Amino acid sequence: GIGSPMSTFAIGKNLKETSEVIGHGDFKYKVDKKWGVQNSNNFPVNHCHEMVMDNKNRIFMTTTHPKNNVLIYNQSGKIEGSWSIGYSSAHGLTIVDEGGEEFLYITDPDKHMVCKTDLKGRKILELDYPKEIKEYNSAEDFKPTETTVAPNGDIFIADGYGKDFIIKYDSKGNYIKHFGGRGDKSNQFDCCHGITLDTREKNNPSLLISSRT
């Protein structure tokens, strides 16, 4: 099922099967348990971790099934397409508009990779473990959970299930720097699972990083 703002699109309107409302205050949602239901034989999922919406209001969702790393839904919950890049544990998903063309960044902590694709699933760039950082002895140390991308194309990777570093690359995948790491200090993390870029102050953007514990 999906929770959606009661005033958003057609989702949450004319729901005959449920009157369940979640949330509180001004943020209340009706649950449509039939939204997004698909044939599990044609579109196996296993687990899903993240969704993003493109400029056409389509929803892209990662799954951990190697047959369908990404499922594409329209606003009505119908599947418009699916594709795979061969990942077994697709996790974090970020969408970025680069000059009018949109791209996805997918992390796979089990495959120890980050992949940039177009919206049709064509691989543009892959990043494996950062050999430039001495704490990483092998790919097994690198288990990325999320990415965010700056307006200039710089890529920030949160290694949330690995060494807990935030690793910065340029748009071509060249290593720039890293910071953080696991620990109890104010500049360290313990499972830096999520990361995004706050650009509300255009001249002073900030990284927002969630540390689970």
Task: Give the role of each language-model region.
Residues 64-65, 109, 160-162, 200, ...:
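Short loop/turn segments immediately following the C-termini of beta-strands
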Residues 1-10:
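N-terminal export signals
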Residues 68-70, 112-115, 124, 164-166:
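Structural signal for beta-propeller blades
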Residues 14, 32-68:
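Beta-strand-rich domains and repeat architectures in extracellular enzymes and scaffolds
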Residues 33-41, 78-84, 125, 131-137, ...:
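A short beta-strand motif characteristic of beta-propeller blades
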Residues 9-34:
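Blade/loop signatures of beta-propeller domains
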Residues 61-62, 106, 157-158, 209:
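Residue position within the beta-strands of beta-propeller blades
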Residues 42-56, 86-102, 132-154, 184-206, ...:
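Beta-rich, blade/repeat-based domains predominating
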